[in-house]
Amino acid sequence: MEIVALLAVGVALGLALGLFGGGGGILAVPLLLAIGVPTDEAATTSLVVVGVGAIGGLIPNARVGRVAWREGITFGALGIAGAILGSQAALLAPEWLKLWGFALLLVVSGTLMLRRALAPPVAAEDRERRSWLLVALVALAVGLVTGFFGVGGGFLIVPALTLVMGMAVHRATATALLVIIINSTAALLPRAGEALDPKVAAIVAITTLITGNLAARWSNKWSSRALGIGFGSLVLAMSLLIAWEALNAG
């Protein structure tokens, strides 16, 4: 695999994570597929890269007290079983199913991002949490998505933390990074020794981490609305690429 291509993926993913937060990790798999990485390896590598990127983003947020540790650990722990089951299912699923499923996931997530960007601003304060049963079910579903598709799931975690756990948006965005770390680690367990090139993962992860830290400093130069519209549109465009891959896979 060409190092230049891997560096390009790391830079692109770092920009996405730095500018758009944890939700940017959804681009990892499409970008890796675009340079010829097989589907299972792309998903496993994505879990490593997004997990490392989340650690890099969590540290500065923790320093300013933005992370809700108890809620994040609880939500992440409730999703561990789903992440493990999702990974095991992905290793058994046919190529075409994973690709079409991921294309659909991109369409749904891109649409949600656009709707969120175009919606009126939500209240900044924490709200009342819903029932623990609902929290557990949502966390399990997020874990399944993380494990099966190899994505961090930030685009699902942030709305889940705000709507289900009643968390303010800025706290949910920071806390989602903690959940991503937990879910990604759990999802990697069934994939241990399977479909992973350590050199590829290391190059992309390090490049992503460096670029992401730099890009995060630029994010305040654009409005949340502009970033949301731009990223949602990009995710929808990437769904076409994955759909094309799925057609070629039969």
Mark where each language-model region is:
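Membrane-embedded alpha-helices of multi-pass transport/permease systems
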Residues: 56-59, 148, 155, 189
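Juxtamembrane/transmembrane-helix interface segments of polytopic membrane transporters
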Residues: 29, 90, 154, 158, ...
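Aromatic-anchored, glycine/proline-accented short structural segments
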Residues: 157-163, 167-178
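Transmembrane alpha-helices of multi-pass small-molecule transport proteins
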Residues: 45-60
